[in-house]
Structures are given as C-alpha cells and as structure tokens.
C-alpha cells in the first residue's frame, strides 16, 4: 500500500506527514524561495508537478501529491504575497536530477514524494532556469486574465 503524504500549517510551521505521522517540519519564515514546476502553461492547479522550497542550506522537494502547492500555498495567500518569494517555471525549461523526478504513466519511477536535498546540489540547476515571478497563484491568474483581454497592452511590444 502506498504511503499518504500531506503537508499542513501549524502556526508558523509547515509540517510534513507520512501516513498521519509527522516526519518533518520547517519554520515558514525561514523559507527564502518557493519554485513551482508545472506542466504546460501552469494554468490549472493540476498542472503543478513539484514544489521546491529553498532554505538557507537545503532545498525541500515536494511532489504535487503532498499538498504543498495546494493546501500550504492556498491557505496563506497573504503570507506568500508579503514575502514575494513564489516563482514558477515550466517543467519543459527545468529539470530535476533523475532521482527526484517522477516517471510518467508508461515509465513509473519510485521518486520520493518528499526529500531534503543540500542546496548546493540544486542551486546550479535552479539558477539556470527561466523563472517567472515573484507572483502568487492569484497574481498569476489575474495576469493571465489581463493578457487574454482584447487590446491588452503587450509588454513585449515597443513603440
């Protein structure tokens, strides 16, 4: 039977559970940056693949099924907006080390649902990614709406 992984807020801490047993805890104010890897345009919550949480010396890698991108992100919009530390990148432009990636349906792998990784291992990869942000999910949604309007100002066009 597969283990059930969950994340939840407890005060100023984010707690990681495996089968309802606490396995890790991070003090949220210690988070320096959160990077969400998404499929396609990342328009729907189901497009999120991984959340990478950067601390001073470590990165926490969460698979989408842990709820970090859902429960933890959505329950405290004001916290993330104030911190301005949430970034986004398409999985087409960013790749994790093979041991951290989850396989597709046709080639499943046993990648971890949650793992702590030394920051020096992931920093060179993340620094090479073309990150969008900082922006919360709500800010990202409104940007998509603005960009889809007819006659919307295109920041890429120059007079």
PLM region spans:
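Eukaryotic intrinsically disordered, low-complexity regulatory linkers and tails enriched in Ser/Thr/Pro
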Residues: 1-159
